[in-house]
């Protein structure tokens, strides 16, 4: 056969298997090529019109007679297999052979056998899809469907043409190449005949074309299956026999009884069918015998969510419930199914409240099927339009027609409609095209949008999937319609804005990418990028840039803005050398895109001195520089005029200096920049003028407190006082820390942000924030230490089973971590709070609500932004909860994004589990769950031990809550470390020593509780459980032990005698449970009187009279006594333990109450106790009964004073009042007024602050002795020597369970009490401090001193300040023996004193350490001075100086047993003081003489009156100490 010429008779037939009706049953195609002379002759006659007309009629007649043939062969006019050309088929009805070739037949013509064109094509009759398109249609080649398991020789190779393409080519040729009429020769490319299309014809044609969709889908699936089978791996079985092939089912008939002793399992098989895949109820149940296996290994903890590891947070849109969560199979019409359905309704209601359109599940399934069907039909639209060849009916015209319909107005905005019409304005058709588009749309909806079909889709749904239509409905920037003629500069800027619109909208200002995770989700559930649109768009940024360039050029050159550039000419034939070049030189013409690039680059470069647009654009486009310069002159491009900037001078803020880069005092109260959780998010400011609230600056008017302007704001440091300019740290040594060796702390650290590599230039943050230097330890050993998150070098951590029972997994440290080091970042999806609530509810198990797992973390509470680490996150999601954790989360501001950083708060060894206190870090749902389980756990959980060595308490659990809660917090069982079931070989839980210590500790605590219950029969258990102490701490002694220790002592110290006398005077006011110990005090009192001088014993009536005097200044005290009596009487029934007197903010049962604060102006009136300010506020009168006696520091830093017993009534005290004492009181007041002693203390004095420490130096008792300490009347004490024992004995006497806090310690520096927020710390008061501060508080208090018995150090003493109506007898009478032993194990309480330089006379500060040296010159023991001062406090003498020794008349030697006249001691001190008089200052002499004059009236003054005088410490004590 000649491949170049001739129209050979080629017939395509199938090798039949002997079918009578000519059906095709063969698996191969046979092509017969007829190259005979007769055929050639027929080709010559083809051009004759009469011959063709006759042949056409004959062919038409034959086609009607052979309609029964299923697969007729097709004649191929030419077949070129040698060169691989495509098949070309010419319709020749004369050569058409309709007979199938029988099996085994022969022919004289050569026959060529080829494989089928398309494997797997089903055997079917001629496709009517193409036959109905034209009456002159000829059948195309139809290949038979090969079996998937047939011979591989019939599979098409990759080089063979696609059968779909071949069909389409044959169809096109058949439609296009029609025979010419008999009078005219046939043209080479005949013009198709125009068809008058109607809606019915189009619908019929679309119905035929629709049949291709399932056929092509089946071909595609078959092809994919066969290709997969070819690439399937070979089986690698060890044996060719299948051991399970002959295995029979061991199912037991459910109707038969179960065999005894054989465990079985019920299995139900369900078949899902019907609409939407619902299961049938006719499932059969089978029973299978099973063998229960218990492995020797511990099972791996289960978890529900497998996370995808991410390094940074990612944005997540609000998502609707797309599928129904499957928890487990439930029986139909059961209670579980109803509960499950109700839960699904709750999920849908949450979506509805969030703004989503809720549809029934059936509609959702139908809509999903509709979307899938639309995606399937979308690729067929354009090919079908080309086949139908309808005039003007193109896809563009269909989109324009869709946009112009009235029903489209409801689904699109006018702007979107305008954008659609403008986008497809280039292909505007004729009116006939519009009519055809309307007919095609109607026909499409008739065929594919039938309401009776499950899968239906409208033409609009197909067109909306177009790649040009979808972005228009995605909030794309609208293009301005062409308007009137604009000036050249405005027209240029409009072109630049249009050209750079995508960069302006999508370009991120942080990472400079166009698809990143920076930005936020708007309310319409659309992402808003952090781009130039956030700061006003492109034009404001360009204008500011031009203005800055002009100012810089004027400063450097002093010329105009059009001055020549300073940089040298470029090497690309620069225009500065060649000008506009040779005009005769041929250059390529400029395209439209090149001109646009030149325009927007010209505007972007602006007035730069270092870069010219000619040189830059020439390098980009590959053109000579002079060519670009010539084009610029042709275009005559000019920038719009720029107004010069006027920078007004702005003063620095009082709390922030942008030039010094530091924060001033009280900055935390002036701004909320550092409080990320409560601040609001504002777009960077881009206004004109200064950044002030009056000018509308969002940064300056951010609520009541401004925030600093960030580097993305368009303001500058010259004009904005709020502009953040980075830190001023240097790069030598380790810098950017909270506490630095030199200079102020880093401002970035203070503001809870990491150093900005752009702004912080001195500390080296740029090099250390580079990820390439993340593991360069040498570089990070110096310089900035505040770029941990930007560095991204987390500590090595591993995942393992948590130490908390039923908690699943936990995170463990794989290396040693020092305190303050960065551990890991908490990453996840950034979601809104509404989305977080829905996700939390979806993940819950409706059948097991207690087992909920939460991975939500509150990032910005004010803005409602959470971090969800359930699906996307890192290993930090496994960190569990503990009250005392070893790491702490912190929200940091890092380059305009907020991130969560975990830092170690203590040293962590490798292998320790990481914990942190969830607290308020987790959102509402988790928080409520935690609180609920805490309440349930507190009610049902016994006391849990605390881990030894100060480790974190494991009673709190992780975020993974469970119904097995038995502990506090969220509630789980005790840690295995606290039990007896821990494995000693376990790496994480083998700690036998700690377990033994905890067991011993539990036994000791139980014994102590039993002893306390026996001694305190009327006392019930306290409301709060006793908190455990480490095994190394000292356990308080019980009352029985202290009583036995004191009664067994052979000798009584003088200071104990004073306490007995004081208790005897108040014996009738004590609680009932203290009466037994009062009898022991009376016996010891007789022995004490033999060793001490006789003294007047205060009577009960006198003490009551001091409380209930009718003077106006005691009115506040009366109200407090009444409140105290009411509280004690009401709370006594429930808990008979004496109430604890709780101090108010400015008053209460504490020394120095009622004094003016420092910030209070003189003459300012205090407020009464009815909820107002004042020294006797009833708010701090008492605490709840049963809370235990305690002594410490309240929330304002002032001392809490322990109060025992009950107060007597006001009337009873008045009845016992005597006239003689009234007269004495009036005389004393008269003397005070004469001597000017009624003045209050200086309002500049401040109360005492306590500093907690962990341990104290075990110094000997004699070294601790010091001179009597001076007590200021402004709520300060300076007792150092007795503070440790005071604290121990106060706790032992008042609250045996209150040993959880460390003892307060003296700090020699000045400290405000408000600087320390230590709550409920024991207060240690010296005798002089107790008496003096008691007088200042309108509450007549007595001083109880506790001294050691025989064998005890007399320097270890305790004072407990209590009111007369609520004092303790025996509880504070026998604590010296325990205090001496506890002083070595517990911290020495040392009180902090504010120096006298803050007082009126500005005396220098006296260190408590210096006062210790004074004891050697005053007395030989510390107990002497304390005893003398305490005695003076009870009898009326003013303590605080050496004159108390003279008035008391008692001297005690170093052993505390021998006594002499105190007047002699006073005389010795006076003589020594006279020798040192030249050293004293004038002010000190005057104050000393005033104190000497006041000593005569000290015995007569009431404690309340004495408290109103200011007492200064004699200077001689300081001189002697120095």
UniProtKB/Swiss-Prot annotation:
Keywords: Chromatin regulator, Metal-binding, Methyltransferase, Nucleus, Repeat, Repressor, S-adenosyl-L-methionine, Transcription, Transcription regulation, Transferase, Zinc
Annotated spans, SANT2L domain: 561-650
BAM domain, as annotated region: 251-300
This protein's name: Histone-lysine N-methyltransferase EZH2
Bilayer-crossing regions: none
CDD domains, alphabetized: SET_EZH-like
Gene Ontology MF terms in the entry: chromatin binding; histone H3K27 methyltransferase activity; metal ion binding
Stated role: Catalytic subunit of the of the Polycomb Repressive Complex 2 (PRC2), a histone H3 lysine methyltransferase responsible for generating mono-, di-, and tri-methylation on Lys27 (H3K27me1, H3K27me2 and H3K27me3). The tri-methylated form is known to be critical in gene repression, and its proper placement is essential in defining repression patterns during development. The PRC2 complex interacts with thousands of RNA species in vivo, but the physiological function of RNA binding has still to be determined.
Residues reported to bind Zn(2+) 6: 727, 729, 736, 746
Composition bias, Polar residues: 141-162, 411-422, 935-946, 1025-1038, 1127-1136, 1316-1330, 1455-1464
Lineage, broadest ranks: Eukaryota, Fungi, Dikarya, Ascomycota, Pezizomycotina
Binding positions for S-adenosyl-L-methionine per the UniProt entry: 809, 852, 854-855, 880-881, 926
Residues annotated to bind Zn(2+) 4: 685, 699, 709, 713
Chain spans, region EBD domain: 221-250
Reactions that this protein is recorded to catalyse: L-lysyl(27)-[histone H3] + 3 S-adenosyl-L-methionine = N(6),N(6),N(6)-trimethyl-L-lysyl(27)-[histone H3] + 3 S-adenosyl-L-homocysteine + 3 H(+)
Means of activity regulation: The end product of PRC2 catalysis, H3K27me3, interacts with EED to stimulate the enzymatic activity of PRC2 allosterically. The enzymatic activity of PRC2 is regulated in a very complex manner and PCR2 can adopt different stages including the autoinhibited (A); SAM-bound autoinhibited (A'), basal (B), and H3K27me3-stimulated (S) stages. Actictivity is inhibited by pyridone inhibitors such as GSK126.
Sequence ranges of Acidic residues compositional bias: 971-988
Gene symbol of the encoding locus: EZH2
């Amino acid at each position: 056969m000649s491949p170049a010429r001739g129209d050979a008779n080629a017939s395509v037939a199938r090798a039949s298997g002997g079918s009578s009706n000519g059906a095709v049953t063969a698996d191969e195609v046979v092509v017969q090529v007829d190259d005979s002379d007769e055929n050639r002759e027929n080709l010559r006659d083809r051009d004759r019109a009469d011959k063709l007309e006759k042949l056409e009629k004959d062919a038409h007649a034959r086609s009607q007679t052979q309609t029964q043939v299923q697969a007729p062969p097709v004649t191929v006019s030419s077949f070129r297999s040698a060169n691989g050309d495509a098949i070309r088929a010419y319709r020749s009805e004369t050569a058409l052979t309709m007979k199938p070739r029988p099996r085994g037949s022969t022919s004289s013509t050569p026959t060529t056998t080829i494989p089928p064109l398309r494997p797997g094509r089903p055997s079917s009759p001629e496709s009517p899809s193409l036959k109905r398109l034209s009456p002159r249609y000829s059948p195309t080649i139809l290949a038979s469907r090969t079996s998937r398991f047939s011979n591989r020789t019939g599979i098409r190779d990759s080089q063979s043409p696609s059968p779909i393409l071949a069909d389409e080519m044959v169809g096109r040729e058949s439609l296009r190449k029609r025979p010419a009429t008999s009078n005219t020769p046939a043209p080479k490319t005949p013009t198709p005949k125009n068809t008058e299309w109607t809606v019915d014809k189009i619908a019929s044609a679309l119905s035929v074309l629709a049949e291709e969709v399932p056929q092509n889908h089946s071909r595609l699936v078959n092809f994919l299956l066969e290709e997969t089978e070819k690439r399937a791996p070979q089986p690698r079985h060890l044996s060719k026999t299948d051991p399970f092939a002959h295995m029979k089912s061991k199912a037991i008939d459910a109707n038969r009884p179960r065999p005894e002793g054989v465990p079985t399992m019920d299995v139900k098989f369900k078949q899902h069918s019907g609409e939407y895949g619902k299961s049938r109820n006719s499932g059969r149940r089978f029973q299978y015998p099973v063998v229960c296996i218990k492995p020797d290994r511990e099972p791996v903890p289960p978890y529900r969510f497998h996370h995808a590891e991410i390094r940074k947070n990612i944005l997540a849109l609000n998502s609707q419930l797309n599928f129904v969560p499957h928890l487990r199979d439930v029986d139909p019409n059961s209670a579980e199914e109803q509960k499950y359905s109700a839960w699904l309704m709750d999920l849908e209601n949450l979506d509805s409240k969030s703004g989503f359109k809720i549809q029934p599940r059936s509609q959702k399934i139908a809509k999903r099927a509709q979307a899938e069907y639309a995606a399937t039909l979308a690729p067929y639209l354009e090919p079908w339009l080309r086949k139908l060849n309808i005039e003007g009916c193109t896809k563009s015209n269909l989109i324009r027609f869709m946009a112009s319909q009235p029903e489209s107005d409801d689904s699109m905005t006018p702007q979107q409609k305008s954008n659609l019409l403008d986008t497809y304005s280039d292909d505007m058709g004729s009116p006939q095209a519009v009519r055809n588009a309307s007919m095609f749309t109607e026909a499409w909806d008739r065929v594919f949008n039938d309401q009776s079909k499950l899968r239906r889709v409208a033409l609009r749904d197909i067109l909306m999937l177009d790649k040009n239509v979808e972005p228009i409905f995605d909030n794309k920037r609208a293009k301005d319609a062409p308007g009137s003629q604009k000036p050249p500069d405005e027209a240029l800027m409009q072109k630049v804005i249009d050209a750079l619109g995508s960069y302006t909208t999508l370009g991120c200002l942080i990472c400079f990418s166009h698809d990143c995770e920076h930005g936020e989700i708007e309310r319409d559930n659309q992402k808003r990028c952090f781009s130039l649109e956030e700061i006003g768009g492109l034009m404001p940024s360009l204008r500011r840039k031009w203005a800055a360039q002009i100012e810089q050029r004027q400063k450097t050159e002093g010329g105009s803005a059009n001055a020549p550039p300073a940089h040298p000419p470029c090497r690309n034939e620069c225009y500065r050398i060649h000008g506009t070049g040779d005009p005769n030189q041929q250059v390529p013409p400029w395209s439209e895109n090149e001109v646009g690039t030149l325009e927007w680059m010209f505007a972007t470069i602006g007035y730069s001195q270092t870069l010219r647009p000619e040189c830059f654009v020439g390098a980009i486009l590959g053109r000579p520089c002079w060519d670009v310069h010539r084009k610029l002159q042709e275009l005559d491009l000019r920038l719009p005029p720029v107004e010069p900037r006027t920078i007004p001078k702005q003063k620095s803020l009082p709390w922030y200096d942008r030039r010094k880069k530091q924060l001033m005092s009280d900055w935390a109260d002036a701004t909320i920049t550092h409080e990320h959780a409560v601040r609001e998010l504002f777009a960077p400011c881009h206004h004109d003028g200064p950044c002030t609230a009056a000018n509308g600056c969002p940064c300056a008017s951010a609520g009541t407190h401004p925030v600093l302007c960030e580097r993305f704001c368009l303001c500058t440091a010259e004009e904005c006082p709020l502009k953040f300019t980075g830190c001023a740290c240097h790069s030598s040594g380790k810098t950017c820390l909270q506490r630095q060796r030199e200079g102020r702390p880093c401002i970035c650290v203070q503001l809870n942000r990491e150093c900005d590599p752009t702004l912080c230039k001195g500390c080296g943050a740029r090099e250390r924030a580079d990820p390439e230097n993340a593991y360069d330890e040498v570089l990070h050993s110096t310089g900035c230490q505040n770029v941990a998150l930007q560095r991204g070098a987390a500590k090595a951590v591993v995942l393992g089973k948590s130490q908390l029972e039923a908690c699943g997994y936990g995170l463990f440290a794989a290396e040693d971590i020092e305190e303050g080091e960065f551990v890991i970042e908490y990453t996840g999806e950034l979601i809104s709070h509404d989305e977080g609530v829905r996700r939390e509810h979806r993940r819950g198990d409706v059948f097991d609500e207690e087992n909920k797992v939460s991975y939500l973390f509150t990032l910005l509470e004010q803005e409602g932004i959470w971090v969800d680490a359930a699906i996307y996150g890192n290993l930090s999601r496994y960190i569990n909860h503990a009250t005392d954790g070893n790491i702490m989360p912190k929200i940091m501001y890092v380059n305009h994004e907020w991130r969560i950083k975990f830092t170690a708060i203590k040293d962590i060894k490798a292998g320790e589990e990481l914990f942190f206190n969830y607290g308020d870090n987790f959102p509402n749902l988790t928080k409520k769950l935690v609180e609920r389980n805490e309440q349930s756990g507190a009610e049902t959980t016994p006391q849990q031990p605390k881990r030894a060595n100060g480790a974190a308490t494991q009673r709190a659990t992780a975020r993974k809550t469970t119904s097995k809660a038995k502990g506090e917090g969220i509630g789980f069982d005790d840690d295995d470390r606290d039990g007896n079931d821990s494995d000693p070989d376990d790496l994480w839980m083998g700690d036998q020593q700690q377990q033994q210590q905890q067991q011993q500790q539990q036994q000791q605590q139980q014994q102590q509780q039993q002893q306390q219950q026996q001694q305190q029969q009327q006392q019930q258990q306290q409301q709060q459980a006793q908190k455990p102490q480490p095994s190394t701490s000292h356990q308080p002694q019980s009352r029985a032990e202290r009583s036995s220790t004191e009664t067994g002592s052979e000798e009584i110290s003088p200071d104990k005698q004073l306490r007995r006398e004081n208790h005897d005077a108040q014996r009738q006011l004590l609680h009932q449970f203290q009466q037994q110990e009062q009898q022991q005090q009376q016996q010891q009192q007789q022995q004490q009187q033999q060793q001490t001088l006789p003294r007047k014993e205060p009577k009960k009536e006198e003490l009551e009279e001091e409380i209930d005097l009718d003077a106006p200044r005691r009115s506040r005290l009366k109200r407090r006594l009444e409140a105290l009596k009411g509280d004690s009487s009401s709370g006594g029934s429930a808990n008979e333990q004496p109430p604890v007197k709780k101090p108010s903010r400015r008053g209460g049962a504490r020394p120095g109450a009622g004094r003016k604060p420092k910030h209070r102006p003189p003459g300012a009136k205090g407020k009464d106790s009815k909820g107002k300010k004042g020294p006797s506020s009833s708010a701090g009168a008492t605490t709840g009964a049963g809370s235990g006696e305690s002594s410490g520091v309240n929330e304002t830093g002032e001392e809490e004073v322990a109060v025992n017993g009950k107060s007597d009534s006001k009337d009873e005290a008045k009845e016992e009042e005597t006239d003689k004492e009234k007269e004495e009181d009036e005389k004393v007041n008269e003397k005070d007024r004469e001597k000017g002693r009624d003045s209050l203390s200086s309002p500049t004095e401040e109360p005492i602050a306590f500093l907690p420490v962990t341990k104290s130096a075990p110094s000997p008792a004699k070294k601790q002795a010091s001179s009597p300490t001076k007590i200021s009347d402004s709520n300060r004490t300076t007792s150092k020597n007795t503070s440790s024992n005071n604290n121990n004995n106060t706790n032992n006497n008042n609250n045996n369970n209150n040993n959880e806090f460390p003892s307060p310690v003296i700090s020699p520096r000045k400290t405000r009490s408000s600087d320390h927020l230590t709550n409920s710390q024991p207060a240690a008061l010296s005798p002089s401090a107790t008496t003096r501060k008691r007088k200042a508080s309108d509450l007549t208090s007595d001083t109880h001193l506790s001294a050691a018995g025989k064998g005890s150090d007399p320097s270890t003493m305790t004072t407990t300040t209590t009111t007369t109506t609520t004092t303790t007898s025996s509880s504070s009478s026998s604590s010296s023996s325990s205090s001496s032993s506890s002083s070595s194990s517990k911290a020495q309480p040392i009180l902090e004193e504010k120096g006298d330089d803050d007082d009126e006379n500005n005396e220098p500060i006296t260190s408590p350490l210096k006062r210790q040296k004074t004891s050697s010159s005053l007395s030989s023991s510390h107990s002497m001075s304390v005893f003398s001062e305490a005695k003076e406090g009870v009898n009326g003498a003013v303590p605080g100086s050496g004159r108390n020794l003279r008035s008391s008349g008692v001297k005690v030697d170093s052993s505390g047993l021998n006594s002499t006249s105190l007047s002699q001691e006073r005389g010795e001190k006076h003589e020594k003081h006279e020798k040192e008089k030249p050293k004293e200052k004038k002010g000190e002499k005057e104050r000393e003489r005033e104190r000497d004059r006041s000593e005569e009236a000290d015995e007569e003054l009431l404690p309340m009156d004495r408290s109103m005088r200011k007492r200064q410490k004699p200077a001689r004590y300081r001189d002697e100490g120095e």
